[in-house]
A protein has these predicted regions:
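Conserved helicase RecA-like core
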Residues: 1-299
Length: 299
């Protein structure tokens, strides 16, 4: 479980280690005004309260826009979604075509929902369609949504492969493929689906990959399917970022962490905008119920 008050501090509660970690991200001098954003994108960013891109966002912008294959090494909390979506959205024009032009693969249902939500915020003033598909939901409902058309599809590998095999989802129109948290994806056993998804895609496309670590499996995937990728790294593979300050507290169980979170959130001056991340839907429901008792409609 983790939460961030935007542009200041992220607090990560690692359930397996029982330690919450305070992560403070320091931003550089570049502002979003310095990037070549469209007015629509900049207005969305401004409404979200962001002024400075994170290092991975700043470094990725021109590289992704170049159209070359990209491999980014960045850890959780560094703003990876905006790092690849801002340059993609900057150049993605309005189209009436039914089939998607951008495919974003993520390892879990929760990440699909999170990425779709962030894309919808960025495209508030842009006429683009985004659709999320994942396992555990009715596939027939998702087939109907696909048939209505979308510009960007965000998916877990298993469900995307099922939709591709059913011939409902046509992937030959994909111009940009993003694989986010590929190391997690491979750890979860999605290698077979990934390899088969590559076969469904056109050869002429841009490949964009983000990973927290550079493992042998990730490296093999890059060698097999990427063409002279540009590599961006805000830290050495598998090491903490230099611009992150971490402080840990021992919390023995979920309820202790929830109480600690509630205690911290009472500091209204420090925590004005907060994002909370948990490991699964059940945890999200439990945490929401606990915070609702304390904060009411604010939670």
């Amino acid at each position: 479980m983790s939460f961030c008050y935007l542009e200041k501090v992220c607090i990560l509660f690692f359930l397996n280690t029982r330690k919450p970690t305070f992560v403070k991200i320091f931003f550089g001098m570049t502002t979003f005004q310095d990037l070549d954003l469209s007015n629509q994108l900049y207005n969305s960013i401004e409404e979200l309260g962001f002024t400075h891109p994170t290092p991975i966002q700043e470094q990725s912008f021109s590289v992704v826009r170049s159209g070359k294959d990209v491999v980014g090494i960045a850890q959780t909390g560094t703003g990876k979604t905006f790092a690849y979506m801002l340059p993609i959205l900057r150049d993605l024009k309005f189209s009436k075509q039914i089939t998607p032009r951008v495919l974003v693969l993520v390892p879990t249902r929760e990440l699909v929902l999170q990425v779709v939500d962030e894309i919808e915020k960025l495209t508030k003033y842009i006429n683009l369609r985004v659709l999320g598909v994942y396992g555990g939901a009715n596939i027939n409902t998702q087939k109907q949504a696909v048939a209505q058309g979308t510009d960007i599809i965000v998916a877990t590998p298993g469900r995307l492969y099922d939709l591709g095999l059913s011939n409902v989802l046509k992937l030959k129109s994909i111009q940009k493929l993003v694989i986010d948290e590929v190391d997690v994806m491979l750890d979860l056993g999605f290698r077979f689906q990934l390899l088969n998804i590559f076969d469904l895609l056109p050869r002429a496309r841009q490949n964009i990959m983000f990973s927290a670590t550079m493992t042998d499996d990730v490296d093999e995937l890059i060698n097999d399917f990427f063409k002279a990728p540009q590599k961006i790294s805000v830290a050495l593979s598998g090491t903490p970022l230099d611009n992150i300050q971490q402080t840990s507290y021992i919390a023995p169980n979920f309820y202790t962490k929830a109480n600690l979170l509630a205690h911290l959130l009472r500091d209204r001056d420090a925590f004005t905008k907060v994002l909370v991340f948990v490991s699964n839907k059940r945890r999200a429901d439990l945490l929401f119920a606990a915070l609702e008792e304390i904060f009411g409609s604010e939670s």
